[in-house]
From Swiss-Prot:
Name recorded for this polypeptide: Trigger factor
InterPro entries in UniProt: PPIase_dom_sf, Trig_fac, Trigger_fac_C, Trigger_fac_C_sf, Trigger_fac_ribosome-bd_bac, Trigger_fac_ribosome-bd_sf, Trigger_fact/SurA_dom_sf
Subcellular localization, as worded in the UniProt entry: Cytoplasm
Gene label: tig
Species this protein is from: Oleidesulfovibrio alaskensis (strain ATCC BAA-1058 / DSM 17464 / G20) (Desulfovibrio alaskensis)
Lineage: Bacteria, Pseudomonadati, Thermodesulfobacteriota, Desulfovibrionia, Desulfovibrionales
Family from the record: Belongs to the FKBP-type PPIase family. Tig subfamily.
Residue ranges of domain PPIase FKBP-type in the record: 163-248
Keyword NADP: no
Length: 438
């Protein structure tokens, strides 16, 4: 077997492999021999079927398997001899083996770019000093208070207000006919919580308990269900009750209910400590990002297109999820798939460049990720999503997602290694950051 390597670009290789006749015939003979041990044909003892009969009867299967086996052996041999590993799937072009003929085929794949690593030992990195924001702490305490509030029916005969809960029946109509799927009974609507369309909430706030009302409601143009986008329908509403939350006092009794704290002061102290730890991690993460971004500015290397496509797909999937949680869709943005991909391309390229740099830094630092560490990470993912660990591992392995997961874990370790070698300079929190937190 001979091969020739052609660099199509700094991150893509094409390899032409030439297989001599002797190796082609040997591969066919080996595959036929496997069939001879397992095939049962009338008139022949098992294992005694002549090779010519096997080749004639199972020609398609034999030649397909022989080709695949031979190509796989060569790919492992050729790729193993190179200084780099594929960063994409390996594309094969070459047809099928033919007996007594030389077999020539090509494989092509993308590789990680080659570049000189910058010196980052002792580089100065500014990191903001974490501070406790009393407004943020108070907001957490208010959320705890709200969660422990008693929900009671309002005795006063009046419409519901923002911050209260309306118990109601509703149904949508178009041209006097009910719209299937847009109706509910005894629905509890939290008013002022962006749970429903503004027009609908205003309609609800007009009715007192026991009263029915109706009015027009217009769905936004970017509504997630295109069937209703921009459409005006008639909503009929009957309010049954108005409920309000009776907030408990911020005292020791609340602290005990919230989590067994011995006092309110102890609960507040715990919330402050948790907030400070969160801010510390946030400040560290921002410093690490600034550090890597600074190093990336000194480097110029191309990104494999397959890697770029993968991150663009991921960013668009995240965008789709965010929009759907808001009752919208990608289509509602009024942009073509190409325009959407162009929008996320710069961010995807930055993520890819960061990943490439950190994986190379991991090699430089001798950082590795064990199979046990990958399994532990998969167990956490499975637990959070409520799925079976073994099923998830098989899915990650089958779809090659496990390699992406390992690289992300490797990148995280490399980030820590670079950070440990940096000269961290603690600076006061920026005023605009503090104001944004408020």
């Amino acid at each position: 077997m001979e091969y020739n390597v052609e660099d199509l670009s700094p991150v893509k290789k094409k390899i032409t492999i030439t297989v001599p006749v002797e190796e082609v015939n040997a591969a066919l003979a080996a595959t036929i021999a496997v069939y001879q041990t397992s095939v049962n044909l009338s008139g022949f003892r098992k294992g005694k079927v002549p090779a010519s009969i096997i080749e004639g009867r199972f020609r398609k299967e034999v030649y397909n398997e022989a080709t695949q086996d031979l190509v796989n052996v060569h790919i492992n041999e050729v790729v193993g001899s190179l200084d780099t590993q594929p960063a994409s799937r390996i594309d094969f072009d070459g047809g099928q083996l033919e007996r007594d003929k030389e077999f020539v085929y090509t494989i092509s794949f993308e590789v990680m770019p080659v570049f000189e690593m910058p010196d980052y030992d002792g580089m100065e990195v500014e990191q903001e000093k974490p501070e406790v924001d009393e407004n943020e702490v108070n907001a957490v305490l208010e959320r705890i208070r709200t969660n422990l509030a008693d929900v009671v029916t309002v005795a006063e005969h009046r419409p519901a207000k923002d911050g209260e809960i309306a118990v109601l029946d509703f149904a949508a109509y178009e041209n006097g006919e009910p719209i299937a799927g847009v109706a509910a009974d005894n629905f509890e609507l939290n008013l002022g919580g962006n749970q429903a369309l503004v027009d609908f909430e205003e309609l609800v706030k007009r009715a007192v308990p026991g009263e029915a009302t109706e009015g027009d409601v217009t769905f936004p143009e970017d509504f997630i269900n295109p069937e209703f986008a921009g459409k005006t329908v008639t909503m009929k509403v009957t309010v049954h009750a108005v409920k309000e939350r009776k907030l408990p006092e911020l005292d020791d009794e609340l602290a005990k209910k919230a989590g067994g704290f011995e006092s309110f002061d102890k609960m507040r102290e715990t919330v402050e400590q948790s907030y400070l730890e969160s801010r510390t991690q946030l400040c560290k993460a921002q410093a690490q990002k600034t550090m890597v971004d600074s190093l990336l500015k000194t480097l110029d290397f191309p990104v494999p297109e397959s890697m770029l496509e993968m991150y663009m797909d991921s960013l668009l999937a995240e965008k789709k999820d965010r929009l759907e949680r808001q009752g919208k869709s990608l289509e509602s943005l009024g942009k073509s798939p190409e325009e959407l991909r162009d929008e996320v391309r710069p961010e995807a390229e930055h993520i890819a460049r960061t990943q490439i740099f950190l994986v190379k830094a991991a090699q430089k630092e001798g950082v590795t990720v064990s199979e046990q560490e990958v399994d532990r990470q998969l167990q956490q993912i499975a637990m959070r999503s409520g799925q079976d660990f073994q099923t998830m591992k098989e899915h990650y392995t089958r779809t090659n997602m496990i390699f992406n997961l390992r690289d992300r874990m490797l990148a995280d370790k490399a980030m820590e290694a670079i950070y440990e070698k940096a000269a961290i300079k603690e600076v006061p929190a920026k005023k605009e950051a503090a104001e944004a937190a408020e």
